[in-house]
């Protein structure tokens, strides 16, 4: 009896202590929320749980891509400011990245400023571009710099997450998606029955190679962060990472189907791949034309892969008036939830255009569908 009383007393003390901490934290926040410097420090030190909406390639700073490109003898196309693989042929519009990064004479520094701006969203508003245009234009420019650097990228984002007191990252990544698309180009027919539209054995082999790619990038991350040291390595080692298989929605229907099939196979085969997402501009003509078809791809494959976790997170409703004709507004979120069975919606800014907005929101609440606002 005395032991039980002591346990109750301890638990009560912990509850009172936690309640006191919560009140003190709330009071501190209220006192500094109009003071940007103190507020930033308060929020940076606050534990934040997980970041559920993060594109691995989009989370890397331009300067990191340039450093790797310089080390790997990559080039910059001076007309398009696109990073390319070497060699940099003399007399062409290709310049070795190592000649201007990390900097030097004034003319070199001027080029560096232009390149960093082109590879990021820095100062985009000064160039007469929308953030939307600039953001989506950067991926093709820095793509070549990411080749062979996936582990370095993983180390960078986990180190940064640790500094921000984020303990979990769910990274959108596309292992094997290009290979699946090439396989669909080689042989596919969406009019055939399930199992015959693309080669399932070929896609399964791609999935196994994709798993090996994840193994390699995680091994490289661990090495860079010295995570195997007895006394612990970099703080980024403590950040748990899982992946969303990232399907590129702007390609031909057969290719998107093959990618979606690959995503479900990865979810089935590898516990590190906890779901899928569709990426690339939702306002792209192909994305708009095939949107309903894509949702039905997910629906069908969810039913066929009942043993997998089937966690669907979708960019949906990332649209606004002026970006697309009004006929494309107000139904993408609804279809993502009702047809594809999405458990999370990315952005979802066009919800107010849905004529059935309250019914859609009610269904999302009932199904506990989260909205990723970032």
Question: Residue spans of the language-model regions?
Answer:
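Bacterial N-terminal signal peptides
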Residues: 7-14
């Amino acid at each position: 009896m005395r032991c039980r009383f002591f346990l109750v007393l301890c638990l009560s003390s912990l509850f009172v202590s936690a309640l006191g901490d919560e009140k003190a934290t709330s009071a501190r926040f209220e006192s500094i929320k109009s003071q940007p410097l103190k507020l930033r420090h308060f929020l940076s030190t606050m534990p934040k749980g997980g970041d559920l909406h993060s594109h691995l390639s989009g989370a890397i700073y331009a300067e990191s891509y340039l450093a790797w490109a310089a080390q790997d003898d990559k080039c910059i196309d001076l007309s398009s400011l696109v990073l390319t693989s070497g060699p940099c042929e003399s007399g062409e519009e290709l310049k070795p990245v190592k000649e201007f990064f990390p900097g030097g004479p004034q003319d070199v520094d001027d080029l560096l400023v232009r390149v960093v701006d082109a590879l990021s969203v820095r100062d985009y508003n000064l160039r007469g571009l929308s953030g939307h245009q600039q953001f989506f234009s950067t991926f093709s420019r820095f793509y070549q710099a990411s080749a062979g650097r996936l582990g370095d990228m993983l180390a960078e984002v986990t180190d940064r997450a640790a500094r921000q007191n984020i303990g979990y990252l769910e990274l959108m990544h596309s292992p094997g998606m290009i290979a699946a698309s090439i396989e669909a180009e080689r042989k596919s027919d969406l009019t055939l029955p399930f199992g015959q539209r693309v080669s399932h054995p070929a896609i399964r082999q791609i999935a196994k190679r994709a798993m090996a790619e994840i193994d390699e990038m995680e091994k490289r991350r661990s090495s860079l962060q010295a995570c195997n040291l007895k006394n612990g390595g970099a703080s980024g080692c403590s950040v748990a990472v899982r992946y969303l298989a990232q399907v590129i929605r702007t390609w031909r229907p057969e290719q998107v189907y093959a990618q979606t099939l690959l995503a479900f196979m990865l979810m089935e085969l590898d516990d590190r791949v906890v779901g899928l997402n569709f990426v690339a501009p939702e306002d792209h003509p192909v994305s708009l034309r095939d949107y309903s078809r894509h949702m039905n791809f997910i629906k069908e494959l969810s039913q066929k892969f009942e043993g997998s976790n089937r966690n669907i997170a979708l960019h949906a409703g990332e649209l606004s008036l002026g970006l697309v004709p009004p006929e494309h507004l107000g139904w993408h979120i609804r279809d993502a939830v009702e047809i594809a069975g999405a458990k999370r919606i990315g952005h979802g800014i066009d919800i107010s255009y849905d004529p059935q907005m309250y019914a859609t929101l009610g269904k999302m609440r009932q199904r506990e569908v989260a909205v990723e606002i970032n």
